[in-house]
Amino acid sequence: FMAMAQFQLIDGDSKQQSNSVYNLPTGSIQSPTADGLISGMSTGAGQWRSIYMTFSAHYAFKSRYIADFSVRRDGTTKFGDNKRWGTFPALSFRWNVVDEPWMKGAQKWLSMLSVRPGWGRVGSQPGAEYLFFSKYTATDSYNGANSIYPSNIRLSNLQWEEKETWNVGFDLGLFDNRVTADFNIYTQMTSKLLMTNVNIPSSSGFPSLSWTNVGKMRNNGWEFNINGTDVVKVGKFRLGFNVTFANNKNEIVEMEPTALANLNKDFDNNNGSYLTRVQLNNPFGAIYGFRYKGVYQYSDYSEVEVPGVSGPN
């Protein structure tokens, strides 16, 4: 049995500055001290902190039955006070079938055979700071006088995006692991999907939300890998191989209507490009196009007779 605890505190900050200048002798000048007329200047700064604590435990019985458990507690200043913390556990098991007493007869050629089910949850956070604050912008464009106006909607209910995964895996090794293979089946549900720049009704006074939780998405699939090491050995020549097969099915389970409208633009795609749509119960970004019915034949319409228009007179 083994247990371990970890703790980490992360402090991040960002700063930016921009100048707009005109009447420069050439457009290749980039120095902010160059002789020119300044039309605008802006600065910005951001700061955020995150903290996480983890606890993990590992237990093995006779090297045949193995269990792992972990839990992670995350907190970040990118969310409001009531949504700042997230808890993300994980649990997995492993049964080394090849080490069972009744498998001794096969151990001469079977070096590994195991089954490993697992479950876990992880979280994602937005890539911006101060989303839960009301911010204001100073301007002098109101009747020539200085003024202040709100520049964002306070996102106090923004939450962690969560991905919950169930999986079952199988491992196989042959001839002292010269040939190995693994097969995994999984299902993953992503809830509270984070999306940026989602358009909202103009009656709110703002064109869009910088970040919001919009819905759920499911992924089901499988993956098969097979590897060979030194399968062919001739002198100093060695030959191995690595082959992978995989299949994934994606489905939008839930999504806010405003997010769907934001993702699905007008049917105005350019010639030669694909039109993609996001719809409930369909894959994310499904490609739309004409259905193929075969090669067009001239005789498909040349032999059709229309009374009074074509055919014998």
What are these regions (language model features)?
Residues 1-280, 285-287, 291:
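Extracellular/periplasmic, surface-exposed regions of secreted and cell-surface proteins
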Residues 37, 76, 297-302, 308-313:
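Extracytoplasmic gating/loop element in the C-terminal half of outer-membrane beta-barrel translocons
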